[in-house]
Design a protein with these regions (language model features):
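Solvent-exposed loop/turn segments flanking beta-strands in beta-repeat/beta-sandwich domains
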Residues: 420-486, 616-651, 687-690
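Beta-strand-rich modules
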Residues: 540-542, 683-704
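C-terminal motif of bacterial Sec signal peptides marking the signal peptidase cleavage site
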Residues: 18-21
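Short beta-strand edge/turn micro-motifs at domain boundaries
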Residues: 355-407, 414, 706-709
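Signal that preferentially marks extracellular ectodomain short beta-strand elements
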Residues: 334-340, 475-533, 658-686
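Feature for extracytoplasmic/surface-facing segments of secreted or surface-associated proteins
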Residues: 26-366, 373-384
Length: 715
């Protein structure tokens, strides 16, 4: 303990009073706990949490501010706790997509309270469940005690773990993250915030915490992190090289880039692009041009995608200025250490942000920028030539006609466009296989699922070395070649009912979806999932031939910004949209079944499929629903080779709760299961069935979650 005190000297700053006020002149002492208290501080996670709201909760768990305070553009705030409120107090800052917490033990404590990812970590250490979201209710229920001593102890343990970073930044050893004075400008203590990513996974009575050091790293390397249970003593970060950290003042540069994009979208559409323009060359607005490296949007490329009406930043060509699109909430992720051929350049900045509009739509995105000759950060993209992407993915697979079979899965989904990589490419340029290696070295193969050269699914699907019957299936290179119908690899799956019987595991009963290890493998344990790095590197190798001995035409890398949750963590921390009761009733009433009543579906009318859903009630925890996807078949004859599986989807703003999905939505040609003369007027053809509706949402950490409603049955 003496060593910790020497390192940090974490002291409570006591309110000083005059002799008269303290009784030296015969007067009575003032009881601060019965007085109003004005509290100030900074709310920032590196960048200011501008325009977020602040609420304070007292000892009884009730909100003490009649009207939530608003965080200023520089992250500062001021709020007055009324005389009637009693501590300890929990501070909650909500920007509409994430909530961050801090604490004040009592009114006699320092009237400065910062709300940052470090204070959120301290709040987690104080919580009996390790979940900052629960802290106020735990205090009210007396299951958690928050005193000055407890706060000091939690702060000391956190700052001891972070000491290597503080030392590298030459920060004063006496710094207290809860009440230190700082400016959210990417320097000093704020640079420390820029360098830290904190993930807290609630799991009932416990929470798992992972702290990642964000810095310069090679494309084929993971970012360093520490992991610990919320009530365990955390290990210290590894030694930190200050030259690898985010450069001083980087976050404001990201913010300036986002402001330039906001100005771009605010320009009238008529002056933003040439009339009818669809490509980067048609962009006329100087605000738009200035957001890209060299003032040239045509220089941008990310996973083979360029700036155009149908690819990246398509809103430049379509969104009216009245929509009020704005870009905010910059987050530095890491910088590229070493240049990669046909990829990013050393020093490129990988960052995240949120866009939103006046209609309540928002989403979380990630991109790559580069410092231009004028010293400003500009968009450049990752410069890779082939589509790439992988993200943690969680799904509730809801069996509409068989509720007892509903199960939850967690794992990863992969962004490999079948159209971009295969169908739309000329002969000789088609990618026929992508081998993917996980951060832990596990290898997976993805291939297109085709019918007559057309993609049955918009993405490459996972391939296995055995088919559903157990027959070995390999290609000319000895790689797996049985094409599933999914790009989602499940690491862990449990029934919603709690049934964990191995013989009843979903992998034994539904062999059309992909589980880690194939049809006869086993799930990963919680400990194995928690060992996966949050910012883990996945390697993608692209092949144009399946000939034995062939080499990949390209090798590319992709880092996640969050690892897969465990099933327990998914259930405890994510709220999902769900189809409306009317739609569910209609689907059940019109269900037909085949193949021993296992394959169930509804006949689709020639018009669009209309999906309707309800949203979770708490927008601060609610992922942004942005995609609806239907799955189905043409010519339903399960034991016949004539049927054609398909998948259609539509993206939309997160404020929506309904979507009409057309046949071949977004395709450039009329698909085999559609009727019509062009994609714009295509309808579902005759004898088409729909068997599933998927509602996909994006969580605040940029990962996707799915509520998949299927009409099929497991048995």
């Amino acid at each position: 303990m003496a060593k910790k005190e020497k390192l940090f000297k974490l002291t409570t700053v006591l309110a000083l009073c005059s002799l008269a006020a303290c009784g030296g002149g015969g007067g009575s002492a003032v009881n601060l706990e019965t007085q109003p208290l004005t509290v100030t501080g900074i709310a920032a996670t590196g960048a200011p949490m501008a325009n977020a709201t602040l609420q304070i909760y007292g000892k009884d768990g009730a909100a003490v501010l009649a009207t939530p305070a608003t965080i200023s553009t520089d992250g500062s705030y001021s709020a007055t706790i009324p005389a009637t409120a009693t501590g300890p107090f929990v501070f909650e800052v909500d920007n509409g997509s994430e909530k961050v917490y801090s604490v004040l033990p009592s009114k006699s404590s320092t009237p400065v309270v910062n709300v940052t990812q470090i204070s959120n970590l301290i709040a987690a250490r104080l919580s009996s469940t390790g979940n900052p979201f629960n802290l106020a209710s735990e205090i009210a229920a007396a299951s958690t005690t928050v005193t000055s001593t407890a706060v000091t102890s939690a702060t000391t343990s956190v700052m001891t773990a972070l000491q290597p970073l503080a030392t590298a930044l030459s920060l004063n050893g006496t710094i207290n993250p809860l009440n230190t004075t700082f400016t959210a400008n990417g320097t000093g203590f704020d640079r420390m915030l820029d360098s830290l990513d904190v993930k807290i996974e609630p799991k009932g009575t416990k929470s798992q915490i992972e702290v990642t050091l964000k810095q310069s790293v090679n494309e084929n390397q993971d970012l360093p992190q520490i992991s610990f249970a919320h009530d365990a003593t955390p290990a210290a970060l590894p030694a930190v090289d200050a030259t690898k950290l985010a450069t001083s003042g980087l976050t404001p540069k990201i913010q300036l880039l986002l402001e330039k994009l906001t100005s771009c979208y605010a320009d009238p559409l008529s002056t933003r692009i040439t009339s009818g323009g669809t490509t980067a060359a048609d962009i006329q607005s100087q605000n738009c041009k200035d957001a890209f490296i060299g003032g040239n949007p045509a220089g941008y490329k990310s996973g083979g995608m360029v700036v155009s009406k149908t690819q990246h930043f398509g809103g430049i060509f379509t969104t009216d200025a009245a929509a009020g699109v704005s870009f905010s909430d910059p987050k530095f992720f890491y910088s590229v250490g070493t240049t990669v051929a046909n990829g990013p350049t050393s020093g490129d900045i990988v960052f995240g942000y949120r866009w939103k509009d006046e209609y309540g739509n928002f989403n979380i995105e990630k991109n790559v920028g580069r410092i231009d000759t004028d010293g400003k950060l500009k968009l450049i993209g990752n410069q890779y030539s082939y589509d790439i992407g992988v993200g943690a993915y969680s799904q509730r697979r809801n069996y509409v006609n068989q509720a007892a079979s509903t199960f939850n899965s967690v794992g990863y989904t992969f962004g490999l466009s079948c159209y971009q990589l295969n169908q739309f490419q000329s002969a000789g340029n088609k990618i026929v296989k992508v081998n993917v290696t996980s951060p832990g070295g596990r290898k997976m193969t993805f291939i297109p699922n085709l019918s007559s050269g057309n993609c049955n699914y918009s993405y490459f699907v996972i391939a296995f070395g055995k088919d559903k019957t157990g027959t070995a299936t390999v290609d000319g290179m000895g790689d797996p070649s049985f094409a599933t119908g999914t790009g989602f690899v499940r690491l862990q799956s449990f029934y919603e009912s709690g049934d964990t019987t191995a013989t009843n595991h979903p992998r034994k009963l539904d062999k059309n979806i992909a589980f880690i290890g194939g049809f006869d493998g086993t799930d990963l344990t919680n400990e194995e999932i928690e060992a996966i790095p949050q910012f883990g590197t996945w390697t993608f190798e692209y092949y144009k031939t399946k000939t034995a001995g062939s080499t990949p035409v390209a090798t590319q890398y992709f880092k996640t910004t969050a690892r897969s949750l465990t099933v327990d963590g998914f259930k405890k921390s994510v709220k999902l949209p769900a189809i409306t009761a009317d739609l569910k009733t209609n689907l059940i009433a019109n269900t037909s079944c085949a193949n021993n009543s296992v394959y169930c579906y509804v006949k689709q009318a020639t018009g669009p499929f209309v999906a309707t859903w309800t949203k979770p009630t708490d927008p601060g925890l609610m992922p942004a629903t942005y995609l609806a996807r239907v799955y189905g078949m043409k010519d339903v004859s399960i034991n016949s080779a004539s049927w054609v599986g398909f998948e259609d989807s539509i993206k939309f703003g997160s404020s929506r709760a309904t979507a009409s999905i057309r046949c071949g939505q977004g395709e450039s040609t009329v698909q085999p299961y559609c009727s019509g003369t062009s994609p714009s007027n295509a309808n579902f053809g005759t004898n088409v069935s729909i068997d599933a509706l998927d509602l996909v949402s994006r969580a605040p950490d940029g990962t996707d979650v799915s509520h998949f409603h299927t009409l099929k049955k497991l048995q």
